[in-house]
UniProtKB/Swiss-Prot annotation:
<keyword id="KW-0432">Leucine biosynthesis</keyword>
<feature type="binding site">
    <location>
        <position position="239"/>
    </location>
    <ligand>
        <name>Mg(2+)</name>
    </ligand>
</feature>
<keyword id="KW-0479">Metal-binding</keyword>
<dbReference type="GO" id="GO:0003862">
    <property type="term" value="F:3-isopropylmalate dehydrogenase activity"/>
</dbReference>
<feature type="binding site">
    <location>
        <position position="87"/>
    </location>
    <ligand>
        <name>substrate</name>
    </ligand>
</feature>
<keyword id="KW-0460">Magnesium</keyword>
<keyword id="KW-0464">Manganese</keyword>
<feature type="binding site">
    <location>
        <position position="211"/>
    </location>
    <ligand>
        <name>Mg(2+)</name>
    </ligand>
</feature>
<dbReference type="GO" id="GO:0000287">
    <property type="term" value="F:magnesium ion binding"/>
</dbReference>
<comment type="function">
    <text>Catalyzes the oxidation of 3-carboxy-2-hydroxy-4-methylpentanoate (3-isopropylmalate) to 3-carboxy-4-methyl-2-oxopentanoate. The product decarboxylates to 4-methyl-2 oxopentanoate.</text>
</comment>
<keyword id="KW-0028">Amino-acid biosynthesis</keyword>
<feature type="binding site">
    <location>
        <position position="97"/>
    </location>
    <ligand>
        <name>substrate</name>
    </ligand>
</feature>
<dbReference type="InterPro" id="IPR023698">
    <property type="entry name" value="LeuB_actb"/>
</dbReference>
<feature type="binding site">
    <location>
        <position position="121"/>
    </location>
    <ligand>
        <name>substrate</name>
    </ligand>
</feature>
<keyword id="KW-0963">Cytoplasm</keyword>
<feature type="site" description="Important for catalysis">
    <location>
        <position position="178"/>
    </location>
</feature>
<dbReference type="InterPro" id="IPR024084">
    <property type="entry name" value="IsoPropMal-DH-like_dom"/>
</dbReference>
């Protein structure tokens, strides 16, 4: 496996260091290339992601990212110039966000209910395509528009991916949308789900408006197995899903090209946390979870299962103990 490593900003390098130790333990011999992308690269060169580096990234099998963002750089510049550019250039049309409440982790929900579902979020369409504009800016007659783009092709491949995952899990898929108001896009999504469902007769299908889904994530999260949704709704509900499972510090994500034409990218959901960077106190658990997602995507199923098991055992016995970044990494390595 040829792996591109982008440690990034803030606590990114610290958590990625521990994640790579785990990767090396379960899959020795991975060929790693490190790329210094983020605030340092921007301040040094004025570029966020040079074209030549993007071409190099395309030659790898997968990408592991730490975190991007720094207060010394204008807000959104790194995110758009690096994360979104990689997503669109490498056709990361699936954003995969597992949501699992591990034993030993305290949920804000009463009674620590059983939570184990996956959100499949379409990653390259919706209102995030930059299709919009503004006129008469700064006047009382300003008009601003953001157009949500939904194509039959894009919706179909997200729905197809979600059904495939549901087939391998508990065989239940929920479409989350708002088709009573967003009638055009909502109709396309629902008709696509119904069409693809015919290929998976043993997968039960449900629909929920996005506002109802947020309620049920809090009151009855056990009803969900696989959720499929568009880019905007997915962006919102995945953070809620992380919150009920103990917080974004325990959330991993995959930005996936399901066709395997381009390398997919895996990262912890948390940010760069510049306020604690360099102190050795950042929790690398989510970065290690990202390694598990990466391994599963690369069909290294046994290695992924070993990492999952080690993380689960670590969380089950950790309690409220405050541990350093390195100590958490050592504990997870020990569980292997």
């Amino acid at each position: 496996m040829r792996l591109a490593v982008i440690a990034g900003d803030g606590i990114g390098p610290e958590v990625i260091t521990e994640a790579l130790k785990v990767l090396d333990a379960v899959l020795p011999g991975v060929e790693k290339t490190e790329y210094d992308l983020g605030a340092r690269q921007y301040h040094k060169t004025g570029e966020v992601l040079p074209d030549s580096v993007l071409e190099e990234l395309k030659g790898h099998d997968a990408i592991l990212l730490g975190a991007i963002g720094d207060p010394s750089v204008p807000s959104g510049l790194l995110e758009r110039g690096l994360l979104l550019r990689i997503r669109f250039e490498l056709d990361h049309h699936i954003n995969l966000r597992p949501a699992r409440l591990y034993p030993g982790v305290q949920s804000p929900l009463a009674g620590n209910p059983e939570i184990d579902f996956v959100v499949v979020r379409e990653g390259t369409e919706g209102p995030y395509t930059g299709n919009g504009g503004a006129i008469r800016v700064g006047t009382p007659h300003e008009i601003a528009t953001e157009v949500s783009v939904n194509t039959a092709f894009g919706v179909r491949r997200a729905v197809q991916d979600a059904f495939g995952r549901a087939q391998q899990r508990r065989k239940h898929l929920t479409l989350v949308h708002k088709n009573n108001v967003l009638t055009n896009a909502g109709s396309l999504w629902w008709r696509t789900v119904q069409t693809v469902a015919a290929e998976y007769p043993d997968v039960e299908v449900a629909y929920q408006h996005v506002d109802a889904a947020t309620i049920h994530m809090v009151t009855d999260p056990g009803r969900f197995d696989v959720i499929v949704t568009d880019n905007l709704f997915g962006d919102i509900i995945t953070d809620l899903a992380a919150a009920v499972c103990g917080g974004i510090g325990l959330a991993a994500s995959g930005n996936i090209d399901a066709t395997l034409t381009h390398p997919s990218m895996f990262e912890p959901v948390h940010g760069s946390a510049p306020d604690i960077a360099g102190q050795g106190i950042a929790d690398p658990t989510a970065a290690v979870m990202s390694v598990s997602l990466l391994l599963a995507h690369m069909a290294e199923v046994d290695a992924a299962a070993r990492v999952d098991k080690a993380v689960a055992e670590h969380l089950a016995t950790r309690g409220d103990e405050k541990l350093s970044t390195a100590a958490v990494g050592e504990r997870i390595l020990g569980k292997l």
